Amino acid sequence: MLSMPSFERKQNIFANKDALGESYQPNKIEERDDEIEKYMDALQPVIDGWEPNNIFVYGNTGVGKTAVTDHLLDQLQTDVEAYDDVTLSVIYLNCKTLSSSYQVAVELVNKLRRPGAEISSTGYPQQSVFKKLYQELEALGGTILIVLDEVDAIGDRDDLLYELPRARSQGNLEDAKVGIIGISNDYKFQEQLDPRVQDTLCERELQFPPYDALELANILDSRTDIAIADDSLAEGVTQHCAALAARDSGSARQALDLLRLAGELAENQDADAISTDHVEAARSELERERVEEGMRELTTHGRLTLLAVVSKAAKADTPSRTRAIYDEYASLCKSAANTDDPLKQRSVHNHLSDLHMLGILSKYENRSGSRGNYYSYELDVPFESAVDAMADVLMLDAEIEKMEGLASRNGVL
C-alpha cells in the first residue's frame, strides 16, 4: 500500500510570492506620477471641506486605475483626520455583476445598513430604492465618496449616475456631501451615457494609458526586489515579461502574472532561477487558459466559427472577411458530427463579434469607399493555443490535423 504524499515548502525561487498577486498593495505606485497628480487635484475639495468632485476614470484592464484609486483614498482618509471639520467615508462597489441603476442602488443601501436590515433585490419601485439610499447616506453624513468600479456594466440604465450627483441640489440630501468615482475599462462607455449624466459624472476625467515596455520593466523590477529570492532571476527575464505584456495590452497585471507563473514553472522543475524559457512557457499556458475560458462561453457553432478562422490562419489567409470565414464555417459544419445545418451569415457575424469581445480574435474595420465598409478577423492568440483548446471539444480530429500540417508548411506554426 502506497503511503500518502506529504506537503513540503518550496522556497528556492520566491521570497514573497504574494508581492506578485492581484491583492498586493505596494507602498509606492510606480510609473503613474502624472495620473496621481491629476487625481490628487480632483480630490482636493474633500480635504478643503467642500463638496467633492465627481470623477470618471478610464483605461484598459491592468493599467493602475483601481490601484491608484485605492492608494489615494487610503491616504486621503488618513489625512482628513488632521481636520476637525471634515469626516470622510468611502463606499466601494464593483458593478461587474450589476446591470442597472436599480441593482447598484440596492447594493449600496445594503452596504450602508446593519446586518439583518438589508432590502430585497426585487420588489421595490426604483425611486423608492433611491429614497432609501438617500436616507442611509444622510444618516451617515459628512463627505461620502462612492467608488463604482467597472461602472460600464450598468450600460445605458444609468439613472442613478444622474440622480445621485444632483441629490443635494434637489433637496434629497442636506448634510451628506456625495461624490461619485466611476472606473471603467470601456473607453466608449462615456459616449453611451445620457448627455445629462456626462455633465454631472464627468466633472473631472482621468485617462490611464497602457504602460509601455520600459514602464512595465520598472514596475516588475520594483516587485522582484520583494518577490524573488536572491540569484533566482536570470538576466533579461523582467524585460522579456515587460515586452510581451506591452506588445499585447500594456497591462501590469499581465506582466506580473507572466512572471509569477514563470516562477512557479521554474520552481516545479527545481530550476535554480527563472529563465526566459520559463516566461515563454508561462505565456503559452496563460494564452491557452484565456482561450479555454472563452471557449466555455461558446456554443458548438461559436466553436466552429473559431475553427473556421483557425483554418484560414493555417492557409496564411488572415485577416479574412466575414464572407470568406462563413464559407469555411459552412464547410466545417458538413464535416462535424451531430451538428445542425449551418447558421445564417448574420449569426456567424455575431459569433465573430463575441470572439473579438473575448479577446480571441482581432477585428478590423475596412473602409472601401463606394463598396461600403466591411470587417475582417484574425486570431489574437497563438495558433497552437486556439487548436489545443478545441482539440478535445470538437470531433474534427482529421480536419484539425490537416490544418496543423498546412500551418506548418505555411510557416504559421
Curated annotation (Swiss-Prot):
Q: Which Pfam families match?
A: AAA_22 (PF13401), Cdc6_C (PF09079), Cdc6_lid (PF22703)
Gene Ontology terms: biological process: DNA replication
Entry's HAMAP family?
Answer: ORC1_type_DNA_replic_protein (MF_01407)
The record's annotation in InterPro entries points to: AAA+_ATPase, AAA_22, Cdc6_C, Cdc6_lid, ORC1/CDC6, Orc1/Cdc6_arc, P-loop_NTPase, WH-like_DNA-bd_sf
Family from the record? Belongs to the CDC6/cdc18 family.
The cysteines covalently paired via disulfide bonds are none
Summary of the knockout phenotype: Essential for normal growth.
Give the protein's function: Involved in regulation of DNA replication.
Organism name: Halobacterium salinarum (strain ATCC 700922 / JCM 11081 / NRC-1) (Halobacterium halobium)
Q: Which UniProt keywords apply?
A: ATP-binding, DNA replication, Nucleotide-binding
> What is the recorded name of this protein?
ORC1-type DNA replication protein 10
Q: Which positions does UniProt annotate for ATP binding?
A: 63-67, 211, 223
PANTHER family under this entry?
A: CELL DIVISION CONTROL PROTEIN 6-RELATED, ORC1-TYPE DNA REPLICATION PROTEIN
One annotated GO molecular function is: ATP binding
